[in-house]
Regions:
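AMP-forming adenylation/ATP pyrophosphatase catalytic core
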Residues: 1-177
């Protein structure tokens, strides 16, 4: 159903570890300084200079120590300046099996192959430059295209491109999610 596709395409939100915001002025530039905060226990584990500087899957530059496994950014909320992080390479917040590209952000190179609402097709999709192609279903709905990957993809971030290809590796279309 459309509701299920929307739910699957949204990043999973976790409250494992997040940041608490403090705002101050530094010179002429307004900077939001925040603290990493472990929600269940209120334990502060670090600081950062703004959610806008972090991407999903980022591990470097977090300056959080004392954990068994590496800490990764699993979600960001830039308007509220919150960063959610999780521990370990296999944290479920790092991967998603579905993403949505809004209708206005879809570009068909092969306009003769553009999908109609309700249509489902099988393509090979890439979400990063030089990434291997991955099998996925593209599902066209009035509010956009949903890409449902066979294998969940790691580090899907807003603002990235997805490009879909035919079986003979011809790029057919793309979009920003």
């Amino acid at each position: 159903s459309d509701e299920e596709l929307m739910r699957l395409s949204e990043p999973i939100r976790y409250d494992d570890i997040k940041f608490e915001t403090e705002t101050y002025r530094a010179g002429k530039k307004h900077i939001k300084k925040t603290r990493y905060k472990d929600n269940p226990f209120g334990k502060i584990v670090g600081r950062h200079d703004g959610a806008q500087f972090y991407t999903i899957g980022q591990r470097k530059g977090l300056n959080i120590g004392g954990h068994k496994d590496s800490i990764f950014v699993i979600a960001t909320d830039v308007p509220r300046n919150i960063i959610y992080v999780g521990e370990g390479h296999t944290h479920k917040g790092l991967s998603r099996s579905c993403l949505r590209i809004a209708s206005q952000d879809i570009h068909w190179i092969r306009t003769d192959l553009a999908m109609a609402d309700g249509e489902i097709r099988r393509y090979r999709v890439r979400i990063r430059y030089r990434q291997p192609l991955h099998d996925a279903f593209l599902i066209k709905r009035p509010n956009g295209i949903f890409i449902l990957f066979d294998i969940p993809q790691r580090g899907i971030s807003d603002g990235q491109f997805a490009a879909w290809y035919s079986a003979d590796d011809e790029m057919l279309g793309s979009g920003v999610y």
